[in-house]
Amino acid sequence: MSELIQNVKTSFEQVLGYAPSHIIQAPGRVNLIGEHTDYNDGFVLPCAINYQTVVAAAKREDNIVRVVSVDYGNAVDEFDITQAITFQQDKMWANYIRGVVKCLLARGYSFTGADISVSGNVPQGAGLSSSAALEVVIGQTFKVLFNLEISQAEIALNGQQAENEFVGCNCGIMDQMISAEGRENHAMLLDCRSLETESVSMPEEMAVVIINSNKKRGLVDSEYNTRRQQCEEAARIFGVKALRDVTIEQFNEKVAELDEMVAKRARHVITENDRTVEAAQALRAHDMKRMGELMAESHASMRDDFEITVKEIDTLVEIVKEVIGDQGGVRMTGGGFGGCIVALVPPALVDDVKATVAAKYQAATGLKESIYVCQAKDGAGLVEVL
């Protein structure tokens, strides 16, 4: 993070002509288990990771917000918070920031503008929530600069609202919530219906290894929408608000009445919810053998019932599983059809995992992986007052 801090300080001083007063950060995240459960009102178990978005900031008194994006060649966006805050077609990065500010104002928070320089190292397009980290760090920045009475949960909800309503991208609450509320060496069990969270301690030093298959993700949006509709149809047939409300026993009684495809989709969600709650217990007990079994079952369910994995992802999972055995766990993470796998790996095996993947993955698939070795880290907050 020190390089990011240096970059935002330098760009702030060069472009805006004076020194910032505060450094704030918000992390990306990875979901350990609980896939496609969020929009079914279910459970997820993410952790925040040590890739983050960092801001250098200072308050203004004239209702102007000026933002410098280090990652877009020090491009600048400027707007007046007393005027209508509008969507910028030609500056997509700026819309996340404008949306967060607009939603904060609509929620009744008062502040008088800010100068902000922002940079991040959360890999974009890998499904590690670079957009949520940006939304949360901007909310956190206004909280810090103006001592706003806003909870971390509301910073998360505000970021989600900005993405849904201003940017126009439909997302659940998980990404923002873990970025805002994460804890070092802990995962977070999140109930996507009540938004209650529970910190789940992880074995210290356990590496969270994220491997991007670099398989270009096709069909994601259309397939995602189809899965969502199938889940909603299953919930209707069961007469419940969401699949969260169906037990596996109820499912088994009624499975014959369901269309085969809908049944497979529903079975994934129902069993995945149970697995996620049990995984939190296993992780808390530092029972990595059980955690590994649950992650393996989750992957098989995504592959066979939800049908969202691809050959490259299945290959990566198999390669990693060979190395870690029952000392950790591995599964696809994220929306599917490419993207990443996540593995919980004892530190002593991290180099073996990297070497084995390097030796076998490209030979099997023709693609070169990207590996990120992470730890579970704290959520958003103030880094330093300058």
From Swiss-Prot:
Enzymatic class: transferase
Residues the entry annotates as binding substrate: E35, H36, T37, D38, Y224
Residues involved in Mg(2+) binding: S131, E163
Its EC number(s): 2.7.1.6
Binding-site residues, ATP: S69, G125, A126, G127, L128, S129, S130, S131
UniProt-recorded Gene Ontology molecular function terms: ATP binding; galactokinase activity; magnesium ion binding
GO cellular component term of the entry, any: cytosol
Involved pathway(s): Carbohydrate metabolism; galactose metabolism
Reaction equations catalysed: alpha-D-galactose + ATP = alpha-D-galactose 1-phosphate + ADP + H(+)
Cell location: Cytoplasm
Domain of life: Bacteria
GO biological-process terms attached to the record: galactose metabolic process
Function as written in the Swiss-Prot or TrEMBL entry: Catalyzes the transfer of the gamma-phosphate of ATP to D-galactose to form alpha-D-galactose-1-phosphate (Gal-1-P).
Family affiliation: Belongs to the GHMP kinase family. GalK subfamily.
Name of the protein: Galactokinase
Species of the source: Vibrio vulnificus (strain CMCP6)
Phylogenetic lineage: Bacteria, Pseudomonadati, Pseudomonadota, Gammaproteobacteria, Vibrionales
